Amino acid sequence: MHCHAELRLSSPGQLKAARRRYKTFMIDEILSKETCDYFEKLSLYSVCPSLVVRPKPLHSCTGSPSLRAYPLLSVITRQPTVISHLVPATPGIAQALSCHQVTEAVSAEAPGGEALASSESETEQPTPRQKKPRRSRTIFTELQLMGLEKKFQKQKYLSTPDRLDLAQSLGLTQLQVKTWYQNRRMKWKKMVLKGGQEAPTKPKGRPKKNSIPTSEEIEAEEKMNSQAQGQEQLEPSQGQEELCEAQEPKARDVPLEMAEPPDPPQELPIPSSEPPPLS
């Protein structure tokens, strides 16, 4: 069942004279041993015309019944372009060819099935997805937070020039200021809705007309805040004056006549301890 190595010298004339003539057109006749020998010589002659070699196969075909029945399959796998148009494509032959090619690759690269196992492991392992690098969280200082909060109380939405000025004054970037404002507005909206009031923005997130204060409203609010602070400073001073007045004696309410000092107390005679004289 196996082809042994032979070495023959031949000429093109002899090869042409030995042209194979099929008796029938059955698949058994086309894939018989004689046809195998003929096409093997033809394929080797195309490589080296003066030397026709029929090599011994590296392994036996005992594992595949198709290769045992049709020895020409070994020639087809080595030179598929020579007789691919002569052999009809059947499912059994295609399966045998694929099995033969895989076994040859395994025996040539890594004995013991190491190459096959490595190729299967490479195909089975999915390629890991590259995770996007997370943006580092900005840590604000107390001074920066106070400045941002104070500006937010006055103006809930910043224009580009205002955002640039605020970022430069606090030593931040525009992106950091914008991100902080977005998070602060979300917190503010939740507080407003929790208090039972109407949402200060439209459903798409756009601010309503009344929610954005104008410059006049901002100036009026600043004036009111300054006045309130002035009143708070005056109230403690007035309270201290009232306490001082309450602690002073009420001498101013007493008339001058009654305000004279009282007479000094009269001295009483001290009784003597001596007994009275006897008569």
From Swiss-Prot:
Keywords of this entry: DNA-binding, Homeobox, Nucleus, Transcription, Transcription regulation
GO biological process, alphabetically ordered: cartilage condensation; myotube differentiation; negative regulation of transcription by RNA polymerase II; positive regulation of transcription by RNA polymerase II; regulation of transcription by RNA polymerase II; skeletal muscle cell differentiation; transcription by RNA polymerase II
One Gene Ontology CC term in the entry: actin cytoskeleton
Record field: compositional bias (Pro residues): 261-279
Biased composition regions of type Polar residues, renumbered to the chain: 118-128, 225-240
InterPro entries per UniProt: HD, HD_metazoa, Homeobox_CS, Homeobox_TF, Homeodomain-like_sf, HTH_motif
CDD domains: homeodomain
Annotated stretches, region: Disordered: 110-137, 194-279
The keyword Phosphoprotein is annotated on this UniProt entry: no
A molecular function GO annotation: RNA polymerase II transcription regulatory region sequence-specific DNA binding
DNA-binding region per UniProt: 133-192
Matches recorded under PROSITE patterns: HOMEOBOX_1, HOMEOBOX_2
Transmembrane segments annotated in the record for this chain: none
Family stated for the protein in its record: Belongs to the BAR homeobox family.
PANTHER family noted in UniProt: BARX HOMEOBOX 2 (PTHR24333:SF15), HOMEO BOX HB9 LIKE A-RELATED (PTHR24333)
Function per UniProt: Transcription factor. Binds optimally to the DNA consensus sequence 5'-YYTAATGRTTTTY-3'. May control the expression of neural adhesion molecules such as L1 or Ng-CAM during embryonic development of both the central and peripherical nervous system. May be involved in controlling adhesive processes in keratinizing epithelia.
Protein name (database record): Homeobox protein BarH-like 2
Originating species: Homo sapiens (Human)
Gene (UniProt): BARX2
